[in-house]
Amino acid sequence: MPTTICAAAARAGLACCLSLATLATAAPAAPAAPAAPGPAWVDQARLEGANSEPQNWFTAGRDQDGTYYSPLAHIDAGNVKRLGFAWAYDLGGPQRGQEATPIVVDGVMYSSGTWGYVYALDAASGKELWRYDPRGDWFAARNPCCDLVNRGVAVWKGKVYVASGDGRLHALDAATGKPVWVVDTIVDHKLPYSSTGAPQIAGDVVVIGNGGSDMGKGGVRGYVSAYDLSSGVFRWRFYTVPPAPGQRLENPELAAAAKTWDPRRDPQYKGGGTAWDGFAYDPALRLVYFGTANAAPYDLRLLGNPNLDGLYTASIIALHADSGRLAWYYQTTPNDHWDFDSVQKLILATLKIGGADRRVIMQACKNGFFYVLDRASGELLSATPFTYINWASGVDRATGRPVPTAQSDWFTSPKDVYPSWSGAHTWNPMSLSAQTHLVYIPVIDTPSVWVDLAHNGGALKFLDGFFSTNGIFPDDSYDAADLERLYGPLPALPALQAERKVKLVRELIRAWDPVARRIVWEHETSSGMRGYDGGVMSTAGNLVFQGRGSGGLWVYAADTGKVLDVINTGSHIMAAPTTYAVRGEQYVAVQVGYGGTGIAEGPVPPSSATVKFENTNRIIALKLGGGAVPTPPARRPEPFARPPEQSASKAAIEAGEVKFVEECSRCHALGINVTPDLRRLDAGLNAQFNDIVLHGILGAAGMERFDDLLSEQDVEHIHAYLIDQAWIAYRAQQAAKRP
């Protein structure tokens, strides 16, 4: 029987108890696990007994419940200052954002990197055993909203499963890395679908979703697919939103959903609701869980009636794993027009309510509420803000619906809305400690200044990734006057700051009591600018680990939040760490590298380690008694070369700025970033600019053709704008050289 810990609920007079199978501070003595039939042999029995094998990290979240908690306690508060370098492995390939948490089974580490590369390493030494290149269609590299990231693999009965960026699902032989089967999961390659999330094992099938709700002119139509674990044979598919009006509904659940969409809506808008991450599975209920993304587009007026719910977007959904039929859903954000996905990681637990055990599922949602739902029925048990919000005054317990405020309505004028479109919590994993019974959440305490581009008087009317809107971060670089030409009139920073006594843009780690529904401790991790700080792991050593963009791996006392150690890696950390043991020695490992949503928001933030050091993608492992972590090579930008002569008119340059922001800025920033700074093109690339952009002559490097979105004149204008920006930078550089 699971251990039970009781406490009084802070709201609604509910007497609650937290009961988790993993809540023992150390696993009880158990017989040694039987020898595995082969490499990477994880099955249901072994996964359910994960606490008796604390040396392994079987899933992305370690266990069936997705807690990101380890019973290992060799490294503890008393000796963590001795934690140091054990080994590092260079991932190679494109140096982009790293968001995966490595899995470790019987001394072998399995992880994924950019685009869906897979690596198998000796977990004690970092020696490469094999590496898998998924190759595929690089034209699809245009499709992900937020870099060519990948959030991990699944390991099951001798196979390693990964989804590559172009939407193919790969099953690899864990011993050799050779593909056993590969299937294409994308239903329409003409639309901007991509896959970046980790697959989910659910009974006899492997389940995968996709992304694209934000992309292109009309987004995509979300769905999840299931395939036979052994053969890759297609088993079922669940669409999360109905098709265009007049088209066939694939299942009865869509008939109910269709009533929440305008039957006259423009079919170019596909509806969104993709499931791009955050799956979970309950083997007892045989239910697979996932969250869905925002509606497409954000401006619901473009869909006709802007007051409809738009099912099943921004929802937590449970499907029967055997059939793919709907068991239940809970919509966290009906009528979503703030990009409030519900795709964040889900944690399974058990709450005792009124003397009865309630199996629950928990999520710190992008919309700022911490949800506890009965995972058998979807009944709402609690919804409590875990950070500052102003878009809603609360959740009506009678209806389960949030109560929006006047501040949330940006249709009439630009508004600062908390949380921002990036969410109060996004993909970065949170962790539930079995020792303290607290959930450790990487929190983004930031608003968006939402702008209706189509009606606010600026030159920009469309922005790839935002449709006809934009959500601007009022960070330390925010200047309303400077932004007005593109975006129209915006609120000034002092007016925005009047709402808060803290920096408008900041990130924190918060210890959250899911029973009492309150903050126990917190630390600010970034301030003034987005830091893109990392996911969280906790251990039975009374430790909480979180990496930061500044390159430090921070270690806290799990009970009090006291800072115990900071280990400098010289690399930006976004992923959650893992911990494991080999031959009795405990290791902590983390995958490092900057990218993700940050590349769409401008240059690398000044606090990031990527400003000082090259963005070398690595897995870094630590152990007691290790030394300092070797940092990547120092970043030494070449000086600006003299740009080509400018022959374009002011009007052409201004038109080029609009097109650059509209179609190019999602990947390219003018400054340090993981993609090229296009002010620094050499003579050869300047001469080939049109062929690169329109005809994709650098497609093999990930820069595919854009002749379907840009005309020859558009490209000439963009080039003129970049040359203008290059001259500005070059003149400033030359002026700085003068005595």
What are these regions (language model features)?
Residues 89-101, 131-154, 182-198, 214, ...:
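Extracytoplasmic beta-rich repeat domains
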Residues 648-670, 685-695:
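Sequence/structural segment immediately N-terminal to covalent heme-attachment motifs in c-type
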Residues 287, 547, 590-596, 609, ...:
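Extracytoplasmic electron-transfer domains, predominantly the class I c-type cytochrome c fold
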Residues 57-61, 97-117, 142-168, 194-217, ...:
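Repeat-blade elements of multi-bladed beta-propeller folds
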Residues 208-222, 263, 290-310, 414-415, ...:
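Short, conserved, GDST-rich strand-edge loop motifs in beta-rich repeat architectures
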Residues 42-45, 634-659:
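Electrostatic cytochrome c docking/interface patches
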Residues 31-85, 244-255, 497-499, 505-510, ...:
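Blade/loop signatures of beta-propeller domains
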Residues 100-112, 123, 425-450, 463-567, ...:
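C-terminal substrate/ligand-recognition segments
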